[in-house]
């Protein structure tokens, strides 16, 4: 059975997790054997979106209905997701990379180390420039912080320079990237991070 790199993708509802997953799956499947697991509380809507967008073949996308608190399924009791990962590994012997998208959650959500090797945490500019300084494990401890929707900064009165300063202060040396996932801005930097930090040979 393969031992793929497992990448957790977290962040609040509407921050752009599924949009990021679409980009990463579409781009990275050209070089790697990729699968994705999505978590929704009561539906498999994110699985449907990913499938409809053509980001990956349908058989490489699995939806997990978590019920209750979405962070429990990625942290305290990750059994459903671990079972889904194992299912994908059995399905695709050559699997090199698997994305696990959490259900929309708050800033305190984190992935269990047994579930994810690397974590990406997505926040968005439209939620206000104060978001980075609010902290929380997703912002301070994720392997890569993705600050999405930079195009909306002028519309919501957010100063990206202030967000950058706050992020540097909250994260220290941990990396972050600004993105506009509508256009794909910043996606290349995220892929480069995953390849380098995840030890993926091109």
UniProtKB/Swiss-Prot annotation:
Positions of GTP binding: 11-18
Subcellular location: Cytoplasm
One GO process term, biological-process aspect: urea catabolic process
Key words, A-Z: Chaperone, Cytoplasm, GTP-binding, Nickel insertion, Nucleotide-binding
GO cellular component terms given for this protein: cytoplasm
InterPro entries linked to this entry: CobW/HypB/UreG_nucleotide-bd, P-loop_NTPase, UreG
Gene Ontology terms, MF aspect: GTP binding; GTPase activity; nickel cation binding
Gene3D superfamilies named in the record: P-loop containing nucleotide triphosphate hydrolases
Its biological purpose: Facilitates the functional incorporation of the urease nickel metallocenter. This process requires GTP hydrolysis, probably effectuated by UreG.
NCBIfam families: ureG
Assembly: Homodimer. UreD, UreF and UreG form a complex that acts as a GTP-hydrolysis-dependent molecular chaperone, activating the urease apoprotein by helping to assemble the nickel containing metallocenter of UreC. The UreE protein probably delivers the nickel.
Protein family: Belongs to the SIMIBI class G3E GTPase family. UreG subfamily.
Name of the featured protein: Urease accessory protein UreG
Native source species: Magnetococcus marinus (strain ATCC BAA-1437 / JCM 17883 / MC-1)
């Amino acid at each position: 059975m393969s031992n793929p790199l497992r990448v957790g993708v977290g962040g609040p509802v509407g921050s752009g997790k599924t949009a990021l997953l679409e980009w990463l799956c579409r781009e990275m499947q050209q070089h790697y054997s990729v699968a994705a697991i999505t978590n929704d509380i009561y539906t498999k809507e994110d699985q449907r979106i990913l499938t409809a967008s053509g980001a990956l073949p349908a058989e490489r996308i699995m939806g997990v209905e978590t019920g209750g608190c979405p962070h429990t399924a990625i942290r305290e009791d990750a059994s459903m997701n671990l079972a889904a990962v194992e299912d994908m590994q059995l399905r695709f012997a050559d699997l090199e990379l698997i994305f696990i998208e959490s259900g929309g959650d708050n800033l305190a959500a984190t992935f269990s180390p047994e579930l994810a090797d690397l974590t990406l945490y997505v926040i968005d500019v439209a939620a206000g420039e104060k978001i980075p300084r609010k902290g929380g494990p997703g912002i301070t401890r994720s392997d890569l912080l993705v600050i999405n929707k930079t195009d909306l900064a002028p519309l919501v009165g957010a100063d990206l320079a202030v967000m950058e300063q706050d992020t540097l202060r909250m994260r220290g040396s941990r990396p972050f990237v600004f993105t506009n996932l509508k256009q794909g801005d910043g996606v290349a930097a995220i892929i480069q991070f995953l390849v380098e930090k995840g030890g993926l040979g091109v």
